[in-house]
A protein has these predicted regions:
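Polybasic, lysine-enriched low-complexity intrinsically disordered terminal tails
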Residues: 1-56
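PLP-dependent amino-acid enzyme catalytic core
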Residues: 3, 39, 43-472
Length: 472
């Protein structure tokens, strides 16, 4: 891998050459407009990005796997899938920009037909099948967005699709896959069990297996997101992409670095399953322990042999985000942007919102919102915990005399402060209160932490023992 400190003259020549390529190879007016704007990037005014952990690992002397995807492959993929996919907007957000300190845009792949970017790669793969392969049908193993992507792509092309999913898959995802006329087989308790069964069925019936990320055609299909980003905002300084197996970031990196070598491509992983970060640090594909995470769409224990060398060469840095940061990002996007995203879809914004990425203050940054297929029960928990941490949902445990009027007195205090009582619960047995007392729990909807403290102080002034429960 070439070091990141490439000379300005070499990079400007590369940009100029790439600009010429996209002008000659692409016919859309939007692409030609993007290429014209990109000529401004040939000015030798930028500084090379600092050497990242990715560059250090790639230069460690470990042998690199071959790169099996080209810019031309991504252009070809775009021509193939164009009529099947929605060119999602890259929406600038003044509100989020003010919150994060950068000029932030969201590439809303959650608006695709299946609710995620996955259909891009699946379509590109399925459209390349031979007549014999199409007749036999396709098979995939997935508990999430890949299942719906394959099912949708197969349905649009009149091909039978069989999807093997773990028995623990939420009913909503099973039904979502079945809506595209796929045959769903529930097998085992994990993805590994489902994958093994899918392999057995492939050999038995001659199906074509559609991998979730580790296939050159899948990578090229996902890379069409990068081409759209270049056309929609050719002056981007950085693009933030969630990483699972690496198919999306690999495709985006090839597409965008070909046209604009100075753009920063930053990957984001769940802290519980940092397989790409571990692999890059080791200089080879390294499997990590599979763990439960709210970002289940990027919980991949082992990255791909096709995706890894692309990330080694083109991705500038990889950061991680924890569960609380992801959950909070989901809530912020829903409340402030009216955008519903799943855990993996929120990972990129979580990294920006929590200032995990250096050097982007004041810069033009795009975050790829990869999907919006979140389980409703999980969303409800996220919202409730988020409201509790923000002080807008409060649980007060109060010891009161076990006599008529005690609860009414507390309720009057709460009403005076104009808080809303959501629930009241008694506990006369499992409490430290004396036999003449009882513990009452008030669940309140408030205006925030300061409002809660006012209520607590007022209750205490009336000689009640009150305790504010801390959120989990």
């Amino acid at each position: 891998m070439a070091k990141t400190s490439v000379s300005t003259s070499k990079r400007t020549k590369s940009v100029a050459k790439s600009t010429s390529k996209i002008t000659s190879k692409t016919t859309s007016k939007a692409a030609q407009k993007a290429a014209t704007k990109m000529k401004a990037l040939t000015k030798p005014a930028f500084q090379a990005a600092p050497v990242s952990v990715v560059a250090d690992a790639a230069d460690s002397g470990a042998p690199m796997l071959p790169i099996t995807v080209s810019f031309k492959d991504i252009e070809t993929a775009r021509d193939a899938i164009r009529r099947y996919v929605y060119e999602t907007p890259c929406a600038a957000s003044e509100r989020l920009s003010n919150m994060t300190g950068c000029k932030l845009s969201l590439k809303l792949e959650n608006l695709q037909m299946t609710g995620s970017y996955k259909e891009r790669g699946s379509l590109n793969k399925i459209l390349r099948l031979t007549d014999k392969e199409r007749k036999a049908g396709v098979i995939a193993a997935s508990a999430g967005n890949h299942a719906q992507g394959v099912a949708y792509a197969a349905q649009r092309n009149g091909i039978k699709a069989t999807i093997v999913m773990p028995e623990t898959t939420p009913l909503a995802k099973v039904r979502g896959t079945q809506e595209f006329n796929a045959e769903v087989i529930l097998h085992g308790s994990s993805y590994d069990d489902a994958f093994a069964r899918a392999m057995e069925l492939q050999h038995e019936h001659g199906y074509s297996f559609i991998h979730a990320f580790d296939d050159p055609l899948i990578i090229a299909g996902q890379g069409t997101v990068g081409l759209e980003l270049l056309e929609q905002n050719p002056y981007l300084d950085a693009v933030i992409v969630p990483i699972g197996g690496g198919g999306l970031i690999a495709g985006i990196a090839i597409a965008m670095k070909e046209i604009n070598p100075k753009i920063r491509i930053i990957g984001v992983e769940a802290e519980q399953v940092p397989s790409m970060k571990a692999s890059v640090a080791a200089g080879k594909i390294t499997e990590v322990e599979r763990a439960s995470t709210i970002a289940d769409g990027i919980a991949v224990a082992k990255v791909g042999k096709h995706t890894f060398p692309i990330v080694q060469k083109y991705v500038d840095d990889i950061v991680t985000v924890n569960e609380e940061e992801i959950a909070n990002a989901i809530m912020v996007l829903l409340e402030r942007e009216k955008t519903l995203v799943e855990g993996s879809g929120a990972a990129g914004f979580a990294a920006v919102y929590n200032h995990k990425i250096s050097g982007i203050d004041g810069k033009r940054v795009a975050v790829v919102v990869t999907g919006g297929n979140i389980d409703i029960t999980i969303l409800a928990k996220i919202l409730e915990r988020g409201l509790a941490k923000d002080g807008r949902l409060a649980s007060l445990k109060i010891i009161v005399p076990d006599k008529p009027g005690s609860i009414a007195e507390i309720a009057a205090i709460v009403a005076k402060h104009r808080a809303n009582v959501l629930n009241i619960a008694h506990d006369r047995v499992f409490t430290a209160a004396s036999l003449r007392e009882t513990e009452v729990e008030f669940l309140l909807e408030t205006k925030g932490k300061h409002h809660v403290q006012e209520i607590v102080r007022d209750i205490a002034k009336h000689n009640f023992h009150v305790k504010l429960e801390k959120p989990a």
